[in-house]
From Swiss-Prot:
Subunit structure: Part of the 50S ribosomal subunit. Contacts protein L29, and trigger factor when it is bound to the ribosome.
Classification via InterPro entries: Nucleotide-bd_a/b_plait_sf, Ribosomal_uL23-like, Ribosomal_uL23/eL15/eS24_sf, Ribosomal_uL23_CS
Example GO biological process: translation
Taxonomic path: Bacteria, Bacillati, Bacillota, Clostridia, Peptostreptococcales
GO cellular component: ribonucleoprotein complex; ribosome
Family membership: Belongs to the universal ribosomal protein uL23 family.
Keywords: Ribonucleoprotein, Ribosomal protein, RNA-binding, rRNA-binding
Descriptive protein name: Large ribosomal subunit protein uL23
Database matches in Pfam families: Ribosomal_L23
NCBIfam families per record: PRK05738.2-4
Gene responsible for this protein: rplW
Gene Ontology terms, MF aspect: rRNA binding; structural constituent of ribosome
Amino acid sequence: MTNPHDVIIRPVVTEHSMAEMGEKKYTFVVAKDANKTEIKKAVEKVFGVSVDKVNTLNYDGKVKRMGRTQGRTSSFKKAVVKLTADSKEIEFFQGM
């Protein structure tokens, strides 16, 4: 993936992810085929910070039923990005 905006899809705003912001950990939904190196480069380029570590989690879609019809929600990949100690915070999350 060449465009970093194709790697980072959206931020995850939950109570748990907001609590981790104090430790300079930020959570994003990322492209399913993105690896840790691509995620690190994309966050550094888009937000202008230096990344220390990237943890990824793959989520399978849940099975949902509506009467006799059965389907699945979309699966997705989540990344928890830890910034270095001397890095500035991501300004996008400051107002939350």
